[in-house]
């Protein structure tokens, strides 16, 4: 998503003096805020929140790479994918990750955004500047998977997920265009959720959201959650996945309108745990919702926060928070990425 420049959140509240009488745990980089006892079963009240990367411009797209036991993530303004390894620290993994053109990019977000692996383990990435989805082969070659719809260029693919049958779903707001919603190069009349079938056929499966952003499946792949990254309508929708892969009209799963006084940010990237809880970035940091849409608690980062990913053994939550990347151990596990059987 695009970086929102808003003043940072006020100083952290003391233990036990938080909104809704919530309990809170503090660290130098973020604090936990429990609003429901179920939150304490997901993240221990004394869990340590650590910083693993800093001095970035706008971190996004965290993805755990089990083959190398490392975390990949995008630094969008710098047009690069970074890698963090617990023993080697932070290194540059892929230069020109989102914009490969010869002419200078005139916007703020040329780089890659969302990252994932396909069912065969190939890195698949949203390339803002090139306005496409690509798969990276073992030799480094980029294979475009989606570049347009009905003869028109995509806006700037933002985030992506595969279902368990190999279909790719991705969001396409205009945040990667130099002038975003008002960019003269914007060709599509909407900002859609798209589906790319295993045979390569692309279809628009949801077009009503102004700024579709982060997305993720429920553990049974029957529901697709999609964030709308707009302050005027900061919601997440839940769509029922139909047998043919299309989506129903959806319902509002959660609404964060009341939380804007508590912190910066809009609905952005999200992940789902094995119990169906949704870990969604939004106002203040990371918001944790039950499968029914009840807000259980928050990880308050004090800065606009873009995305999350589960990694290591599946129970560590990595958080891309503005210029930093954080991690916290959880008591749950993320839904594993689907793999070909």
Predicted regions mapped to residue ranges:
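Bacterial N-terminal signal peptides
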Residues: 8-21
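Positively charged n-region of N-terminal signal peptides that target proteins for export
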Residues: 1-4
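Sequence-structural signature of mature extracellular/luminal beta-sheet repeat domains
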Residues: 23-341
């Amino acid at each position: 998503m695009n970086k929102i420049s808003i003043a940072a959140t006020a100083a952290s509240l003391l233990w036990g003096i938080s909104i809704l009488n919530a309990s809170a745990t503090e660290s130098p980089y973020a604090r936990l805020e429990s609003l429901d006892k179920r939150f304490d079963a997901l993240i221990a009240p004394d869990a340590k929140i650590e910083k693993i990367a800093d001095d970035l411009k706008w971190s996004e797209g965290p993805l755990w790479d089990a083959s190398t036991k490392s975390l990949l993530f995008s630094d969008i303004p710098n047009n690069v994918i970074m890698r963090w390894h617990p023993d080697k620290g932070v290194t540059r993994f892929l230069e020109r990750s989102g914009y490969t053109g010869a002419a200078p990019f005139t916007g703020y977000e040329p780089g890659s955004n969302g990252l994932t692996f396909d069912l065969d383990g190939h890195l698949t990435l949203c390339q803002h500047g090139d306005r496409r989805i690509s798969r990276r082969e073992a030799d480094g070659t980029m294979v475009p998977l989606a570049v347009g719809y009905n003869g028109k260029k995509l806006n700037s693919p933002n985030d992506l997920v595969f279902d368990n049958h190999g279909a790719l779903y991705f969001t396409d707001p205009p945040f990667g265009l130099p002038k975003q919603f008002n960019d003269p190069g914007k060709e599509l009349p909407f900002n859609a959720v798209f589906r790319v079938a295993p045979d390569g056929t692309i279809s628009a499966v949801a077009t009503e959201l102004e700024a579709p952003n982060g997305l993720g499946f429920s553990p049974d792949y029957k529901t697709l959650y999609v964030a709308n990254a707009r302050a005027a309508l900061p919601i997440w929708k839940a769509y029922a996945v139909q047998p043919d892969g299309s989506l129903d009209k959806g319902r509002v799963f959660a609404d964060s309108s009341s939380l804007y006084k508590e912190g910066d940010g809009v609905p952005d990237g999200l992940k789902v745990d094995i119990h169906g809880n949704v870990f969604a970035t939004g106002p203040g940091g990371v918001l944790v919702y039950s499968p029914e849409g009840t807000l259980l608690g928050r990880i308050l980062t004090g800065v606009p926060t873009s995305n999350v990913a589960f990694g290591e053994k599946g129970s560590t939550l990595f958080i891309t928070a503005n210029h930093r990347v954080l991690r916290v151990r959880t008591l749950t596990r993320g839904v594993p990425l689907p793999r070909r059987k």
